[in-house]
C-alpha cells in the first residue's frame, strides 16, 4: 500500500461505520476521514477510533480510497454529486462501493473511467471475524485492489471473487449474520424453555455457535459429517435433529438464501 494513504468514508451507518473502524485499525484513525448525514455517527467514530470528522468535499479532494457506504437506493444520487469533484482529481484514487447488487459497470457509467472496487462485507467485520468479498471494476488495477485489501485486513477473511459471484456471496455472508442471529435467538429461547436463565442460555448458545464454526474450520470436515459425529444411536441429539428436519429447517435456510440472492440482484437493477 502506498505509504500515508488516506481513506474517506461517505455514509457511516451500520456497515460503513464498522468498516471505517476496521480501516482505522489498519491505517490509524488519523488517516481515516468520515462523513455522514447524521453527525452523531461520525462523532462516535471520532471518539472510538480517532477518525477525522470531515465534509464530503474534503474526502473527495484528498483521500486515495473513497468508500461509499450508503444504501443502494441512495447511491445514484450520491454518484451524481461526487462525479464533478472527482473529475478535478489529477492523482490516482480508488472508489469502493459496498452497495448490495450494484455492479461496478453501473458505477463506472455514472463516474467515468475511474478505478472501482466492489466489496461485500458483513457486520462481524467489527469483531475481526468477518468476511469481505472483493471484485475489481474494469479500470481498477492490482495496486488498487491490494491497497483496499490491506486496509480491510483487520476485518477477518478477505476473498477476491469474479463479480459474477458477488451477489450469491452477499446472500450467504452479507445476509447470513441475520439468519445466524435468528438461530442463536431461537436456541436461547429453547434453553429458557428447558429451565435455564436467559443469561445462561445466551452464553451457551453463543459459545456453541462460535465453537462449532471454529471446529468446522479447524478440521476442514463437512458440517454434515460433524453433525453425524455427535448423533449417537437413540441419543438426545438425533431426536432434536429429527425435529429440525420435520420443520424443514434446512430447506427454510436454503429458501432464505435464494430469496436474499434474488433481492440482491433486483437491488442492482
Ligand atoms: N448492513 C449490513 O449488514 C450490510 C452488509 C453488506 C453490505 N451492506 C451495504 O452497505 C451499505 C450501507 O448499509 P447500512 O446497513 O450501513 O445502511 P445505513 O445504516 O442506513 O447507513 C447509511 C448511512 O449513510 C447515510 N447517507 C445517505 N446518503 C448520504 C449521503 N449522500 N452522504 C452522507 N451520508 C449519507 C444515511 O443517512 P440516512 O439514513 O438519513 O439516509 C445513513 O446514515 C448498503 O449499500 C448495503 O447494501 C450492508
Model-derived regions: residue spans:
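NAD(P)+-binding Rossmann beta1-loop-alpha1 motif at the extreme N-terminus of oxidoreductases
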Residues: 1-57, 61, 130, 192-194
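Rossmann-like NAD(P)(H) cofactor-binding subdomain of soluble oxidoreductases
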Residues: 19, 40, 49, 58-134
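Short pre-catalytic strand/loop immediately N-terminal to key active-site residues, enriched for Gly-Thr
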Residues: 116, 166-171, 223-228
